[in-house]
From Swiss-Prot:
The keyword Nucleus does not apply. Its EC number is 2.1.2.9. Attaches a formyl group to the free amino group of methionyl-tRNA(fMet). The formyl group appears to play a dual role in the initiator identity of N-formylmethionyl-tRNA by promoting its recognition by IF2 and preventing the misappropriation of this tRNA by the elongation apparatus. Coiled coil: none annotated. Disulfide bonds: none annotated. GO terms for cellular component: cytosol. One of its GO terms (molecular function) is methionyl-tRNA formyltransferase activity. InterPro entries: Fmt (IPR005794), Formyl_trans_C (IPR005793), Formyl_trans_C_sf (IPR037022), Formyl_transf_N (IPR002376), Formyl_transf_N_sf (IPR036477), Formyl_transferase-like_C_sf (IPR011034), GART_AS (IPR001555), Met-tRNA-FMT_C (IPR044135). This is Methionyl-tRNA formyltransferase. It catalyses: L-methionyl-tRNA(fMet) + (6R)-10-formyltetrahydrofolate = N-formyl-L-methionyl-tRNA(fMet) + (6S)-5,6,7,8-tetrahydrofolate + H(+).
Amino acid sequence: MKKLNIIFAGTPDFAATHLQALLNSEHNVIAVYTQPDKPAGRGKKLQASPVKQLAEVHHIPVYQPKSLRKEEAQAELQALNADVMVVVAYGLILPEAVLKAPKYGCLNVHGSLLPRWRGAAPIQRSIWAGDTETGVTIMQMDIGLDTGDMLHKVTTPILATETSASLYAKLAELAPPALLEVLNGLTSGQFKPEKQQDEQANYAEKLTKEEAKLDWNMTACQLERNIRAFNPAPMAYLTLMVNEVEERIKVYQAEVLPHQEKTVGTVLAVDKNGIQIATQQGVLNITQLQPAGKKPMSVQDFLNGRGDWFKVGSVL
């Protein structure tokens, strides 16, 4: 195994997990690229990314260009003379000059089994679509969006209770060892590049707040998947009128019950076991929810003091 000089590019916690794995390895992280500090919290103070915070602890030079399209930024990166650049949830587009700068190019850790889900939200979309398995792909980056040759894949099942939060955590454990395997075998050609089958690709669009609103014209199965896919953000929700005020309630957990021939959105039953609502196909039984300004709670706790919010026979 050849010890590699690595540039690491990433921003959130998921990326920091990979940076830590590289720091624990035999390889040498010579520089870190991350997004510029951004205002956060109530005071809107500038907040360094998790990757920057970790890099500074280990006294690694940090670069935070707003863009890598400018020649000065590209020249600065090329001057580092890296063997390879590892990119994990960085958030900036890499021009061709950057992709070609390191000796072995740029490797990306992608949170799906390519080419199934390309794009910004592969973890969430795999749950949303009802996939039964997912994983991580280590790929050689090219100028396309997640279109590069695949070097290594590791799979994991998607459980029936999986949320985006739990799957994110699972992939954060799975991915760093897979990345290290590829890096350790990079110079020996152990991992053969495999072309993606473009016709099998789907684009994993970011989840929107509009999409997060539960639509009773969907099936109960799809709504239940949405609830899990949209957790922890932007969180699935429903609205209902309470004393002429629209209440917005986040939904954390639900289950699918057999279909009843009722108008979609009809409240069928309300008790400690759940709030049952008719959908286009099947009944959605909501078991955990969160009223505005409160913590997530069971239906039983929700109904204490709010027993008249959901009226049996009413249509949401």
